[in-house]
Amino acid sequence: MRERAKLYIDKRVDQSDGSILEIVIWKLPNPTAERPHGYKYRLNYSLPDGTTLVRYDNETGKGDHLHIRAKEYPYTFTTPEQVIIDFINDIKNNEGQL
């Protein structure tokens, strides 16, 4: 029987201003070439219309990266805890520009 990914965290918060904060992290059964750290993740802070303000993800074919509005930057994933800290810090640090 093939091992399945295990949900590490799945959290969504609908903010009073209508923005959405979502954190989803999966622990993969085994590391892969694209995800050598063994995690698949999506951390997203967006407007109600879906416009991305801050997003961290490792979508297939792109590897670890982050988005601040429409700009994309490389990201070095270390741990699930650290990616959450980095995500929250980017929201706070870019607050006036988002």
What are these regions (language model features)?
Residues 1-65:
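The feature represents the first ordered module of a protein
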Residues 71-98:
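Short, compact, well-ordered microdomains
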